[in-house]
Amino acid sequence: MTKYKSTDQVMKIISDKNKIRNFGVIAHVDHGKTTMSDSLLAHSGIISPSSAGSALAMDSMKAEQERGITIVQANVTLHYQEGENDYVINMIDTPGHVDFSGRVIRSLRAIDGSVVVCDAVEGIMTQTETVTRMSLEERVRPVLYINKIDRLIKELRLTPEKMQETLANVVSDFNDLIDTYAEEEYKEKWKVSIQDGSVTFGSAKDRWAINVDIMKKKGVTFKDVIDA
């Protein structure tokens, strides 16, 4: 992700439809969707890095700020650069509470892929299953972001080996959902894996995330990440 682009620069990029990506962030309530969105906004230069995680910029309604939950879906356009290529990413932050599931479905019908945010300690919860099922029913391919890794370190004080086991269990449980709800032709194709980079883990509150591709590029191990 790179810094803020002017409207003219964005318009130039989106003149090529192949440079546009649309994705939504879906999750169980309080698993860190909006905090993760804050981190992406900060990395793009839209909000201050110091306010990421507390600004809850995608929760613009007073009721959302007061209750600490997302009630209506909100969208933002971000710039992303990979190598020499520029992309425009339209991100939708969706509600996590079961009462607002209808708004999640509407968002899923406007996107290419979904990021399922899951608390590393709580794992797959009821609404995690619900929004993942919705994504699969709308033929929107999900990837997995395991959030709140800091809780495994600071609260549970797990060893790196035990943490890897915990993360593997979350991935396995998530793939069980895909096996249960995906159409037959996608059951194996859409399963996520740490090894292929479709699983990312991190701490949205602390504004970091990493997957196997990044670890290979930077030459770091899982233990290096934890020790840092």
Could you tell me what each predicted segment is?
Residues 1-29, 120, 124-228:
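P-loop NTPase catalytic nucleotide-binding module
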Residues 1-118, 124, 131, 156-159, ...:
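P-loop NTPase switch module centered on the Walker A-proximal segment
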